[in-house]
């Protein structure tokens, strides 16, 4: 296994589990099957050596990375690597309006021994950089002179972004910048958008002198330098001479820069293309205004000396200034704010009191649960030793807020290993009963704060986030950023746009990309011009824009902007850091993850619906986790809508695993992640579970840790327990081993711990090296693959709860899932179709019966779709309609409705199409005919001024037309499925319905047909593509080998519905059709798939 290769392939894991040798010619370190879903790996410098010491000292003081978002074409790491190769004395990173790349820049520079200068180019104009091809307004280039200058710059960047009121529009106050500088900044006159160069271009030398005088008055002559650049343009020399001539008059320095926007010359074309994208133009149309970038790459001191031979002192002055401004990003990270505890308490004592109070509720008295209380004492001691009581108090406070506001939440991940978290009500898993290792969560050797993920029902999460802002103050709390990078589809689309291809061509090429990872000969890029592919390849993985992390929040004891600027997110009332979670971790910012979980919302809705319509109060904590009927349902793979086990891969595994007890659900959650199992391979656990393979242990000392998973290591906690049992590690040492073997592997730590493991196993058990080799190899193989058992336990509870509702209250379960959309694996159409197959009647929307969202009728046995699901209506208008009905009674007619609610023609016609006027005794065609006239009748208009309201005799719609209308209006056909209208034709062709495939002998060839609901090609599947087809009787999993997919690629990639001839595989109870040929069927009713998600 290699150090940096990520999780092993399934085939490699099976080989390790079975203690088999590698096959001849097989690499010891196979390439990973797909992209890692882990955090950013530790930066590793390239192998190429550093250039010889340059004879001409030079520092680049004006450089943009890709974190200037479409105005830089190299990563900060690439810029540093090139600076090291060129032997620059220092490198400044001066991205637009932010310090987005500062941490990556600092990490790479530390590895390569490059001195760092931190700065930013401030956009002083009134508009966003992407609002116009060449937005007006000057720029100010600021270099921080040391840590204090950095702090002041960061605070001013944050102030400007927040003052702008919206994302991407910082509003600077030049007077405030002047006051903030305080001698801790150095100002360069900058590029063509700088005050001085802009004045020179617009008004000549006198105007330039006035602009320079203003900068000197504001910041001081010792803190201002004239910047000269030379990009090979005709007027470069004339402009530089005019600028340099101003220096003696004002007593300022002169420095040479390249104004770099990329590391090396090879990225010039990409930089131009990104500039065109920024301006929403093509390269051809942007050519007239796009800034020249021919020479905008890093250069050596010798090359700069040749370019500025007429003024060599400008080159050496740049080196001197760079060395003056350079410093390392050794920021002292803020701590958590002191937690407000009652008088007479410290944070430690208050945490102890809260924990012991909760422990009595969870465990009873200490006499009844001595193990639990001993574990709590141990954990409290470690927490106090590491000075983390405030962290736990903050998390407890968030959980308390959720409970008091009737918001479902639960901690998950490694936090569930903590008895303190369990006692505080943060987690729902008893770590003592489940024998979980606390050190997986927190140990004395840990080099950072613990990581507690809080799952919060998604529809209520915003309340929790705003509570944190209100509780700690917006200056002290912010969300963590998510850097949105270029991937295949958007890379091809944007580069095609930059090269001037039409919108339709951009769409077509983008749609044909599924999982393209770069090769120019991939079938995914067939027919796309080479120049598009070349640029798309170059731009892949570069930042495109800044998003917001799914739930990470940082809380500090001093303004966060002292360390990192904050700006507005797109979402209303959300402020976000300019750094992602990896940057925050590297600097030591304390992060809390408040994650929205749709299933928690669905469960809450289900609880409320069952209570309201059936009078049954459901307490999730009191459900019988051993109920056989729940496990029987899951063993049939009847799990559409069920949390975590509804994917096709999970459904294929459930009949093989045949869950019987709760722990089987824990294993099921861990077995299939992140997606379907690699095509054709079956996990050794299932073979052992079904008695096909014997349960074996390489050494008796492994049995205690692996007994409950039949000798197969699945969980990270088992890896740690094996180190304890086999080699005598302490729990803290075992956690060090787990982390050393993890995604950020350390060669030196691995070497030391490997030696410790071998010595320990020899001393403790006298095991021979052959046995130790096999044991250690298994630990290494599963270090990355292993799932936290605590995480699986937390999720398994939700698997059971959602399964229980599906079994006992299918109508409420369906309505709850519809309310909680968007969530889960299946579309609302598939969820409703599954509910019908379970005997649930579903009614369409009705203006006098529906709520804004889905609800129940007929004593909770039938579902009524919500008005918010109707096209053009939405939740707000739907809620307004419902409130009007409640306040003033049911609507008596279409005209009564439109008189009381001013609906547009479009909205009225959409409701008519959805059948929402059936309560008025109108057919759909009649309602559609009358909708326009009714919508134009207003109290302020004379009667009859609108369209004619006379409704002629109209024929009713056919079932097919009704279904098409339903799907158009709501995306759901409540009482039909598109394939049923073709059933006679399909029967005549010999097509087997999905529900009858179970009776087809294994290996037989069949013809099946259905709407495509999903297309997936997981990275672990060796090129296999999985399709999910659905007809009116059920669903079927279709496996397409790479050869079949290649032969039918265009059809398979785009057809809404398919005819598939293939071979049935159902020997294990999980039905799959291995496709041999694909054909098209045409559905009269629309259907959409969820592809490659």
UniProtKB/Swiss-Prot annotation:
GO terms for biological process: DNA repair; DNA replication. Residues 12-25 have a biased composition (Basic and acidic residues). GO terms for cellular component: cytoplasm. SMART domains: POLIIIAc. Keywords: Cytoplasm, DNA damage, DNA repair, DNA replication, DNA-directed DNA polymerase, Nucleotidyltransferase, Transferase. The keyword Ribonucleoprotein does not apply. GO terms for molecular function: 3'-5' exonuclease activity; DNA-directed DNA polymerase activity; nucleic acid binding. InterPro entries: DNA_pol3_alpha_NTPase_dom, DNA_pol3_finger, DnaE2, DnaE2/DnaE/PolC, DNAPol_HHH, NA-bd_OB_tRNA, PHP_dom, Pol/His_phosphatase_N. Residues 1-55 are annotated as: Disordered. DNA polymerase involved in damage-induced mutagenesis and translesion synthesis (TLS). It is not the major replicative DNA polymerase. Belongs to the DNA polymerase type-C family. DnaE2 subfamily. This is Error-prone DNA polymerase.
């Amino acid at each position: 296994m290699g150090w940096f290769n990520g999780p092993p392939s399934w085939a490699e894991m099976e080989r390790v589990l079975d203690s088999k040798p590698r096959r001849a010619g097989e690499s010891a370190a196979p390439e990973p099957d797909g992209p890692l879903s882990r955090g950013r790996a530790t930066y590793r410098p390239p192998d190429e050596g550093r250039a010889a010491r340059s004879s001409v000292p030079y520092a680049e003081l004006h450089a943009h990375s890709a974190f200037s978002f479409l105005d830089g074409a190299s990563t900060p790491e690439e810029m540093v690597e090139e600076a090291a190769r060129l032997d620059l004395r220092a490198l400044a990173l001066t991205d637009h309006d932010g310090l987005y790349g500062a941490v990556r820049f600092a990490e790479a520079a530390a590895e390569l021994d490059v001195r760092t200068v931190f700065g930013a180019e401030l956009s002083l104009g009134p508009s966003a950089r992407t609002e116009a091809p060449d937005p007006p307004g000057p720029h100010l280039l600021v270099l921080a002179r040391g840590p204090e200058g950095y702090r002041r710059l960061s605070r001013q960047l944050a102030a400007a972004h927040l003052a702008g009121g919206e994302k991407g529009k910082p509003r600077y106050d030049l007077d405030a910048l002047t006051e903030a500088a305080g001698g801790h900044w150095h100002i360069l006159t900058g590029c063509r958008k700088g005050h001085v160069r802009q004045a020179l271009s617009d008004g000549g030398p006198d105007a330039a002198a006035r602009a320079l005088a203003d900068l000197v008055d504001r910041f001081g002559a010792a803190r201002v330098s004239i910047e000269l650049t030379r990009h090979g343009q005709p007027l470069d020399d004339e402009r530089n001479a005019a600028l340099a001539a101003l220096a003696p008059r004002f007593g300022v320095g002169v420095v040479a820069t390249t104004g770099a926007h990329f590391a090396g010359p090879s990225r010039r074309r990409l930089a131009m293309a990104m500039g065109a994208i920024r301006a929403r133009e093509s390269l051809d149309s942007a050519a007239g205004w796009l800034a020249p970038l021919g020479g905008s790459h890093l250069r050596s001191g010798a090359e700069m000396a040749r370019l500025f031979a007429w003024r060599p002192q400008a080159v050496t002055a740049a080196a001197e200034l760079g060395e003056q401004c350079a410093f390392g990003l050794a920021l002292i990270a803020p701590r958590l704010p002191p937690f407000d505890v009652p008088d007479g308490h410290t944070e430690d004592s208050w945490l102890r009191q809260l924990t012991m109070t909760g422990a009595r509720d969870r465990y009873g008295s200490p006499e009844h649960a001595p193990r639990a209380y001993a574990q709590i004492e141990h954990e409290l001691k470690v927490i106090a030793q590491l000075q983390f009581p405030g962290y736990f108090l903050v998390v407890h406070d968030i959980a308390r807020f959720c409970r008091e506001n009737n918001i479902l939440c639960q901690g998950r991940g490694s936090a569930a290993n903590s008895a303190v978290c369990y006692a505080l009500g943060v987690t729902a898993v008893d770590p003592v009963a489940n024998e979980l290792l606390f050190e997986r969560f927190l140990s004395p050797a840990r080099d950072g704060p613990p990581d507690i993920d809080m799952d919060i029902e998604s529809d209520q999460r915003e309340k929790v986030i705003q509570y944190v802002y209100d509780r700690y103050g917006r200056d002290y709390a912010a969300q963590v950023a998510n850097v949105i990078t270029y991937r295949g589809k958007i890379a091809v689309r944007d580069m095609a746009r930059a090269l001037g291809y039409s919108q339709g061509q951009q769409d077509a090429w983008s749609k044909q990309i599924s999982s393209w990872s770069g090769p120019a000969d991939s079938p995914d890029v067939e027919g796309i011009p080479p120049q598009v592919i070349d640029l798309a390849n170059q731009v892949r993985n570069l930042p495109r824009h800044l998003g917001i992390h799914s739930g990470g929040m940082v809380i500090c004891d001093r303004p966060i902007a002292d360390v990192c600027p904050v700006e507005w997110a797109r979402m209303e009332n959300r402020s976000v850091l300019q750094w992602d979670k990896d940057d925050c971790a590297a600097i030591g910012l304390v992060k809390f993850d408040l994650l929205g979980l749709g299933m928690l919302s669905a469960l809450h809705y289900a609880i409320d619906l069952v209570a309201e319509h059936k009078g049954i109060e459901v307490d999730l904590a009191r459900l019988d986790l051993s109920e056989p009927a729940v496990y029987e349902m899951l063993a049939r793979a009847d799990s559409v809508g069920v949390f975590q086990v509804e994917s096709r891969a999970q459904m294929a595994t459930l009949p093989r695993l045949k869950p019987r007890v709760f722990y089987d659900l824990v294993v099921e959650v861990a077995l299939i992640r992140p997606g379907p199992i690699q095509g054709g391979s079956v996990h050794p656990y299932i073979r052992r579970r079904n008695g096909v393979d014997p349960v074996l242990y390489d050494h008796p000392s492994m049995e205690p840790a692996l007994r409950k998973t039949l000798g197969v290591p699945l969980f990270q906690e088992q890896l740690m327990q094996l180190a304890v049992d086999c080699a005598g590690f302490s729990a803290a040492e075992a956690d060090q081993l787990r982390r050393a073997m993890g995604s950020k592997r350390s060669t030196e730590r691995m070497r030391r711990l490997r030696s410790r493991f071998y010595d320990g196993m020899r001393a403790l058990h006298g095991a021979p090296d052959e046995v130790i080799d096999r044991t250690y190899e298994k630990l290494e193989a599963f270090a990355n693959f292993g799932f936290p058992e605590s995480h699986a336990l937390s999720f398994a509870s939700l698997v059971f709860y959602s399964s229980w509702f599906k079994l006992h209250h299918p109508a409420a379960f369906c309505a709850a899932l519809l309310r909680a959309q968007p969530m889960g694996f299946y579309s609302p159409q598939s969820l409703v179709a599954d509910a019908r197959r379970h005997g649930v009647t579903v009614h369409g929307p009705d203006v006098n019966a529906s709520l804004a969202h889905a609800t129940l009728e007929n004593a909770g046995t039938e579902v009524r779709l919500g008005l918010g699901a109707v096209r053009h209506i939405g939740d707000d208008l739907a809620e307004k309609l419902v409130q009007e009905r409640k306040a003033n009674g049911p609507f008596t007619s279409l005209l009564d409705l439109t008189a009381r609610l001013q609906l547009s023609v479009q909205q009225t016609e959409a409701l008519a199409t959805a059948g929402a006027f059936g309560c008025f005794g109108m057919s759909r065609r009649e309602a559609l005919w009358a909708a326009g006239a009714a919508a134009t009748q207003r109290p302020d208009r004379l009667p009859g001024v609108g369209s004619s309201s006379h409704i002629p005799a109209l024929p009713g719609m056919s079932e097919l037309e009704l279904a098409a209308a339903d799907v158009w209006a709501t995306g759901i056909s409540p009482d039909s499925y598109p394939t049923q209208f073709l059933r006679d034709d399909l029967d005549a062709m010999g097509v087997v319905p999905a529900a009858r495939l179970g009776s087809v002998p294994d290996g037989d060839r069949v013809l099946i047909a259905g709407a495509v609901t999903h297309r997936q090609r997981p990275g672990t599947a060796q090129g296999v593509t999985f399709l999910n087809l659905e007809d009116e009787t059920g669903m079927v999993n279709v496996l397409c080998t790479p050869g079949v997919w290649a032969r039918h690629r265009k059809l398979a990639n785009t057809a809404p519905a398919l005819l598939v001839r293939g071979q049935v595989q159902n020997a294990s109870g999980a039905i799959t059709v291995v496709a041999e040929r694909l054909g098209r069927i045409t559905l009269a009713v629309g259907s959409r798939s969820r592809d490659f998600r």
